[in-house]
Swiss-Prot record:
This is Enhanced filamentous growth protein. The lineage of its organism: Eukaryota, Fungi, Dikarya, Ascomycota, Saccharomycotina. PROSITE patterns: HTH_APSES. One of its GO terms (cellular component) is nucleus. Belongs to the EFG1/PHD1/stuA family. GO terms for molecular function: DNA-binding transcription factor activity; sequence-specific DNA binding. The keyword Transmembrane helix does not apply. One of its GO terms (biological process) is positive regulation of transcription by RNA polymerase II.
Amino acid sequence: MSTYSIPYYNQMNGNYNNGMPQQTTAANQQAFPQQQQPTTTGNASQQQQQAAATAAAVQQPYNYMFYQQQGQPGQQTGQTAGQQQQQQQQQQQYDYNTYNRYQYPAATSQGNYYQQTIPNQLSQPQPQHYNGSNRNYTSAPSGAPIPSNSTSGPSQQPPLPGQQAVPIPPHVSTMQQPTPVQDTLNASSTSTVGQFQPPGIRPRVTTTMWEDEKTLCYQVDANNVSVVRRADNNMINGTKLLNVAQMTRGRRDGILKSEKVRHVVKIGSMHLKGVWIPFERALAMAQREQIVDMLYPLFVRDIKRVIQTGVTPNAAAATAAAAATATSASAPPPPPPPVAAATTTAATAISKSSSGNGNSISATSGGSNVSGASGAGSTTSPVNTKAATAAGIPQGNYYQTYNQQQYPQQYGQYNAPGKNQNTPASQPGSTTNDQYLQQQQQQQQQMYGYQSNYYQGGAANSSYYPNYYQQQQPNYASSYPYQQQQQKQQQQQPNQQQQSDQQQTSTPSGGAGTRSVHQSPQVQSLTQGSVHPSPQQHQANQSASTVAKEEK
């Protein structure tokens, strides 16, 4: 035992309030225990009560040691065993009930704490990154520190607002909504999209059936590596994912071995073998390696919607809403039935025009841009057939934009009901159509931001038919008064078209290309001529004769 008396001991601890006259007797007894006789039981209990009252009033920081030093001289001076038990009971009651500065939880609460945290980690091997409320990928586990507040009985702090003070079963209190290990994609926790459409990239997904696992798979190719995502639990082949990042084998295997949730596949086709990891971890790795955009739309959460419509879900909703507002504000778009009719009769009309009219381009000219542009409804350009078939369906949002930007003014001139080419009323219709197209382009630039680079030539620059817009429209206007004379000339000279055919074949390829750019709209007029026969055929014949005159 130390030789310091109790008031000095308190002063050493920074507590100057205990120098009371009642305390000095206890101090004398403890400082000089040999000189005093054994005290009575009432005196000892008085001392203990006084010391407990003063300590509770002051709350000195080291009261546990203070009580032990007070208890030891009493034991040395011959107190009875009952007094020692009373002292120990008071020590226990005091330590855990009135001492609220450090808040040691009771033994039962510590047991509950470990019961709640440890089995949770055992029963749920899924790392805490994929858990409900954690968006960032490197956060601490969310469930661990909660039970100390919810179950420790003597602690003075109020429990958290979402929890009760009653002890709760472990699996309920730590995780309010435990996610199953099988489904590694939490649509409610993180962002609803997962990945937006990067500029300049169109979605390319292959859907395959994995027979062994009996699930669908979504396969995206990048850097000559096919990365696969399962449809049932959204796990992704991490081996192939890191191969896209061109990572070395050692680093790749080290990263995948450290994953807590992984599924190793050793049997099957090449793109299915490897270590499969959860969706969130794969997304984190892809973001770290900066390969997310290359793998679009693998990380779009609602990837089925992308496959059906061809656009990211919230982007599709935004484009549909913007298109609805634009159509209500400006002139109505061209009606879909003539477009569908043009697609059905496109091949026959082009074959007829290639045999009858020498100025048109044959449909067999393959994949060149000029022939693709010659028939807006021709079956050679896949984008237009999809757009024409999906014209009345809301899923056609993705492809309609390509149509209206590639062939804007032809649709305005030839498809507008009640407007012929040779009437001057086509010009105000084309201006309203220009406004509509500008709005469409602005929306496209807002949504995607890249199509202006690819399709600049719609209405603004007209790079597809530059000479047509500058020269051919004045030809229509100037040739209109002489229509009857030109018809007579055509009747007198039926062989002009054959001569123009021979001239075109004799001219070099560059000249033929420029003429084909001039004459490509006439093919369209002929395809539309299958719907509205009489005026467009006259117009095609007139324009053919004028071009033949120019060549002479």
